UniProtKB/Swiss-Prot annotation:
Family matches, as InterPro entries: Preprot_translocase_SecG, SecG/Sec61-beta/Sbh
UniProt superkingdom: Archaea
Topology Extracellular: residue spans: 55-58
Protein name: Preprotein translocase subunit SecG
Biological process per Gene Ontology, one example term: protein transport
The family this protein is said to belong to: Belongs to the SEC61-beta family.
Lineage, highest ranks first: Archaea, Thermoproteota, Thermoprotei, Desulfurococcales, Desulfurococcaceae
Species: Ignicoccus hospitalis (strain KIN4/I / DSM 18386 / JCM 14125)
Topological type in the membrane: Single-pass membrane protein
Role: Involved in protein export. The function of the beta subunit is unknown, but it may be involved in stabilization of the trimeric complex.
Length: 58
């Protein structure tokens, strides 16, 4: 049986393309890190409050 040869550079080229794509998207969106931390904090507080409300309703 003949062996199939793999192209060596495809994976690296694809990875570099993905990094460039996400860098471009990140530049367009511009979300401040404080907003991300604030949203995560608010979501965790809401989750705890909802859990307490559901436990109290039982």
């Amino acid at each position: 049986m003949a062996r199939k040869r793999r192209k060596g550079g495809e994976g690296l080229v694809t990875a570099i393309g993905l990094v460039r794509f996400y860098e471009e998207v990140e530049e367009k969106i511009k979300v401040p890190p404080e907003a991300v931390i604030g949203a995560a904090f608010a979501l965790s507080i809401m989750t705890i409050a909802l859990d307490l409300l559901l436990k109290a309703a039982r």
